[in-house]
Amino acid sequence: MPHTEEFDVIVIGAGHAGCEAALAAARLGCQTLLLTLNLDRIGWQPCNPAVGGPAKSQLAHEVDALGGEIGKMADRTYLQKRVLNASRGPAVWALRAQTDKREYAAVIKQVLEQQPNLRLREGMVTDLLIGPNDEVQGVTTYFGSSFRAKAVILTTGTFLGGCIWVGNKSMPAGRAGEFAAVGLTETLQRLGFETDRLKTGTPARVDKRSVDYSRLEPQPGDPEVRWFSFDPEAWVEREQLPCYLTRTTAETHKLIRDNLYLTPVYGGYIDAKGPRYCPSIEDKIVRFADKESHQIFIEPEGRDIPELYIQGFSTGLPEDLQLALLQTLPGLEDCVMLRPAYAVEYDYLPATQCLPTLMTRRVEGLFSAGQLNGTTGYEEAAAQGIVAGINAARFVQGQDAIVFPREGSYIGTLIDDLCTKDLREPYRVLTSRSEYRLLLRADNADQRMTPLGREIGLIDDRRWALFEQKQARIAAEQTRLTQQRVKEHDPVGQAIAQQTQAPIKGSATLADLLRRPNFHYIDLEAHGLGDPSLAIAEKEGAEIAIKYAGYLQRQQAQVDQVVRQSQRPLPVDLDYSAITSMRLEAREKLARFRPLTLGQASRIGGVNPADINALLIWLEVQERQRSQVETALVR
């Protein structure tokens, strides 16, 4: 009889979701197996080697604040860092790091290899072992090995039924040079899961030695480096490399328009939906036909490799046309192409088949995370991965699952959208997707998430002490700013009045001064009124709490009001077909998605406020009838 190894948790796939899931489960005490097609491609960045950007940076901060890795990896392997939207409000500040893709993969692999309770293994999972009560019991690989576990996490990325396209040529692959995973899609379909197809793409890579940099606009990193991780041990000061900017030309646009029919999408070879917010260059030319030019960013992929990533220039054109297309860009007239661009089509599981814990509704103990759930982006994958890892561990250990509410984090917003909206295109997190973005800032991710990470067991004593010390310093600085005053006739008071074009009447606290437009903590420091012992993040934390206090209080009041209503639980066996006062479409959608709370029900596409009102009335009538029956029985 073949030997079967036993684990608590098995993770299938070692991309950004799989790495976070495996680490979380192992750190919570579960014997964990991480299975991957290729041990040399763990934590790989197959598209843009970058972490962060609008809303994505908030996810990276939140994962770190919970005890995850993606932020630490970016801080240890960055080539360049910039804060985007720095001139706007703190709700949309976004840190972005260009990373060294090979170094990133090497460092995360080392972290995984050194993690207690975690074992890595190369293998292709083709089947799931299912028990008599529709519970997962383990997995089987292509070559016949079996591994048993009480929880299995699917983080297969673009590999399920993966097929890459260049022009009208295709081959089975999860990404260039790596074979696709076979069999698992059929297993999921046999178990009753719905699967569908999505597509994404990646641009060509060119040799940095063949580029004319005099024709490009340099994009340097910020002189003052910021960090994703709240743990100073992850911070590595290093020399930054520049990125560059060029633009498409009329020649670029003509070449694309003349050859659209040769691309897999416009040629009709594939019809899977691609990412709306990261379109191919041909999509841009078609959708924005009135634009004369589009920005193209030239970004390094590593310190010691010659490859440049051509951001914003993914294409499905045939390989023999791609070089001609690249050479229409200023600065790239003589460029050498090292890797062609390609599109990849793959199977995914619409995430409405998952609970907000990321356990599937159909099979107990089976979790799904990352690109398999229909998302796009390393940060979205990492966020789902840590949630799946936490909840898989808690499931195995008989503990209650953790649900992240959308009003508490971008992680919660992401998962709530996935589980309640019938999304049929790759999902990318955006600040506009959160109704509470002023509260869900990057700077306060540790305030929001680290206490939960501590409660779960992912934040150790050292990290917790750092957190408490930081919060104490911010609170003390807020107190000082509200108490220390500047007098009208003091030289510093006169200087500030002149700077802000507003007189100081009698005296003003430093907090009053911070509330003035275009006056910041850095200005207090310029007048000798700051605290030089504080870290930048602590100064910003104190300033934001004071400057935006009114807005923050109003939004928190809105959240509290929404939470009171939205957290009302709905019976899991509720017969929506019986609510005849509700529209048929709403009844069908609610019966299909089975929301757990009133808030989830209200966010399902096709369910409007009138439907929610009808549901509330029906629930109240049912409650009254139950009370009357219980009263009659007592009598």
UniProtKB/Swiss-Prot annotation:
FAD binds at G13, A14, G15, H16, A17, G18. It is found in: Cytoplasm. SMART domains: GIDA_assoc_3. Its cofactor is FAD. The keyword NAD applies. It comes from the Bacteria. GO terms for cellular component: cytoplasm. NAD(+) binds at residues 274-288. GO terms for molecular function: flavin adenine dinucleotide binding. Gene3D superfamilies: FAD/NAD(P)-binding domain (3.50.50.60), GidA associated domain, C-terminal subdomain (1.10.150.570), tRNA uridine 5-carboxymethylaminomethyl modification enzyme MnmG/GidA (1.10.10.1800). Keywords: Cytoplasm, FAD, Flavoprotein, NAD, tRNA processing. GO terms for biological process: tRNA methylation; tRNA wobble uridine modification. NAD-binding protein involved in the addition of a carboxymethylaminomethyl (cmnm) group at the wobble position (U34) of certain tRNAs, forming tRNA-cmnm(5)s(2)U34. Homodimer. Heterotetramer of two MnmE and two MnmG subunits. Belongs to the MnmG family. This is tRNA uridine 5-carboxymethylaminomethyl modification enzyme MnmG. It comes from Synechococcus sp. (strain ATCC 27144 / PCC 6301 / SAUG 1402/1) (Anacystis nidulans).
